[in-house]
Amino acid sequence: MPVDFHYGVRVDVTLLSKIRRVNEHIKSATKTGVVQVHGSACTPTLSVLSSVGTAGVLGLRIKNALTPLVGHTEGSGDVSFSFRNTSVGSGFTHTRELFGANVLDAGIAFYRKGEACDTGAQPQFVRTTISYGDNLTSTVHKSVVDQKGILPFHDRMEAGGRTTRLLLCGKTGAFLLKWLRQQKTKEDQTVTVSVSETLSIVTFSLGGVSKIIDFKPETKPVSGWDGLKGKKSVDVGVVHTDALSRVSLESLIAALRLCKVPGWFTPGLIWHSNEILEVEGVPTGCQSGDVKLSVLLLEVNRSVSAEGGESSQKVPDSIPDSRRQPELESPDSPPLTPVGPFGPLEDASEDAASVTSCPPAAPTKDSTKRPHKRRSDSSQSRDRGKVPKTTFNPLI
């Protein structure tokens, strides 16, 4: 069966080795995620996506890390290919191998098996080739391309010109993360994160408790995080309007932890107009390469928690209820005796007949039992020990 080569890129392993620390920090979350090659066909972007908690999406995007192969015929247009980071039934993890320390060269190729003339068909398989530094060892891994095609959505968020954002200093971020962990229980919890333009405060509310963080508003027009990174020991924010988001507590805790990479990123909050809260890793210094790390926290539906509370308060049918009406009588059952205000309405003759017809009750065993005699303290015969009997022994 002929093999149709569709698209291929060469990986800049030198750039990936410089940001290996970021991959080591998030490798537990991205192991079960998805690797994406998307963007322009001439300058594609390498991304790693993974779910965080119950309502969060982690995204690591690296630009200028992929170079298209010379044999690619379609030089213009956009590409979007997705495949699992860890293949099903295999222990091969793409990010672990591509970010390795002893990697000399790496390439990713997308192809399909079928007629070569079918140029419009999507690729079916991906082949990852890795050569190591000893010039002898190499690895070739083949896996399946996701046919559904996950569209890259991190770059489609609104531009950072009019967004409300807050940069947390290291001390505030550690204190907030500790407080959120103390409020966490085994159940799914929703935390409300609101920011006030007038008061210059951010409020985290859940379960009847709240935590308020004051920040210094930035009045000068800034572009992105560049105008906020100068004040390291102060919480600085740019607020254009009041904003509110309801997110999962589990996802928020994980996002603050993942976006805190010592020497690389510190967490910052962004409120989007579509009620999505984004926790972005703000670079702390001059980084090598265009790397972006962020977690999108989706809006949690309030009706889900309300339905859960009603279902927990529902009384099961097996518990008897005194307010229930009496069951209907069958035609074979005897009629009920009407009851008056002072007792059942019956004739005196019927009462007398019922009394005389009943035989006397036989005495029970408990009633015939003789009463227990109380032992007196003066009786010393019962307090003495058992005296052995003296009998005739013929052997003596």
Swiss-Prot record:
Homooligomerizes and adopts an oligomeric ring-shaped structure composed of 6 subunits. Forms a complex with the DNA-binding protein, the DNA polymerase subunit, and the alkaline exonuclease. The keyword Transcription regulation applies. This is DNA polymerase processivity factor. One of its GO terms (cellular component) is viral tegument. Coiled coil: none annotated. InterPro entries: DNA_pol_proc_fac_herpes. GO terms for molecular function: DNA binding. The lineage of its organism: Viruses, Duplodnaviria, Heunggongvirae, Peploviricota, Herviviricetes. Its main location: virion. Plays an essential role in the viral lytic DNA replication by acting as the polymerase accessory subunit. Stimulates the viral DNA polymerase activity and appears to function with it as a holoenzyme. Increases the processivity of the viral polymerase, probably by acting as a sliding clamp that prevents dissociation of the polymerase from the active template. GO terms for biological process: bidirectional double-stranded viral DNA replication. Keywords: Activator, DNA-binding, Early protein, Host nucleus, Transcription, Transcription regulation, Virion, Virion tegument. Belongs to the herpesviridae DNA polymerase accessory subunit family. Transmembrane segments: none annotated. It is found in: Virion tegument; Host nucleus. Residues 306-396 are annotated as: Disordered. Residues 376-386 have a biased composition (Basic and acidic residues).
